[in-house]
Amino acid sequence: MIEYGAEFPSVVQTAHKENNTVPIYAFVPKDRKDKVPVILILHYWGARDIKAERSMADRLAERGIGSVIVTLPYHLGRTPPGYRSGQLAIQPSSEQLRATMSQAALDVKRAIDFVEGRPEFDSAKIGIAGTSLGALVAALVYGVDSRPRLAAFILGGVDLAEIMWSSSLVVEARDALRRRGYSYERLQLELTEVEPLTYLHSRKESSAFVIGGKYDTIIPRSSTTGLIGAFDNPRTLWLETGHYGGIFIQSRVFKEVANYFETEFSGKPYLPPRRIYAPTLRIGVQAAYPTGFDIGVGIDLWKSNDRGDLVVVGLLTPRGPQVFFGGRVSQGLSLGVSGSTTRVGFGLFWSRVL
């Protein structure tokens, strides 16, 4: 695979000069004989490197498909001094959220301009793929720009206001919005111009591949199903994980993304697998009588349904391995029995699926 970098000025100029230049990284199959299809790859929020995106680029190159990784606003080399990568991308202000999403979409559109001018890429076969925040931006771009023919959304969704109002990752920003008098309805109204659903009706008949996490608390499941519902015939794949558990099957997921683009660009319909095995991993705290408090990491051994109304979890705790069996009380909270080879307790188990 041949790799080269480039950069261009952002369409939007901000108060932070580092954020005003867009680095991109292009990857071309080494043995290409003609122009190749190309995928714009967008990374997740807070990315500190592009290792995952390079892995996707490798998978695509194996299928004779090129790719271009686009650095999103306030991330990686666009991060101003004194801030973490992505820290300024999501702020408790509808005005700032609109500005960042608009800048991201315009930067990706300019990256598509770049692709169209390169002799190694086939401008008639452009796709877009994003993970998490990258999937949100990809959905917006797919709605406002007709040049990408195909799109893959990994752990993404729609309804930005719902994500801000429900995600377990933006608690501080959500609390700040509430202190400023925001409601979900007000935020939804003020984000209309950067909401993917505002524009995706134009792509209702277009191809799309949506990969969601059944137990995702960062991108709410309702947001992912909303994205699925924006298309007439989307390809879908639900992982038995939360937002982070997919890292354990990243290679398999990227393989399916590459399968999707290769198949659909060839003019054939892509059929996703019914499921990809992924362990459902949890971190949790239990309070049981008479055994007391414990923290642990665990794996689901059995559950009665997708909601986990009844669940058996194998746990590794500082006191040794344990098994918890219980029933769901509310989101993330179960009541039941936990035990090891030497003791048994009855109580509560709070957990979050990774």
Predicted features and spans:
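N-terminal cap/lid segment of alpha/beta-hydrolase-fold proteins
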Residues: 1-31
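Short beta-strand element of the alpha/beta-hydrolase
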Residues: 35-44
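Cap/lid segment of the alpha/beta-hydrolase catalytic domain
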Residues: 45-105
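Gly/Ser-rich "nucleophile elbow"/oxyanion-hole loop immediately N-terminal to the catalytic nucleophile
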Residues: 88-129
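Hydrolase active-site cap/lid region
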Residues: 137-183, 238, 248
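Short beta-strand/loop motif that positions the catalytic acidic residue
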Residues: 203-204, 209-212
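Feature captures outer-membrane beta-barrel proteins of Gram-negative bacteria and organelles
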Residues: 227, 293-306, 312-315, 319-338, ...
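Catalytic histidine-centered segment of alpha/beta-hydrolase-like enzymes
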Residues: 242-254
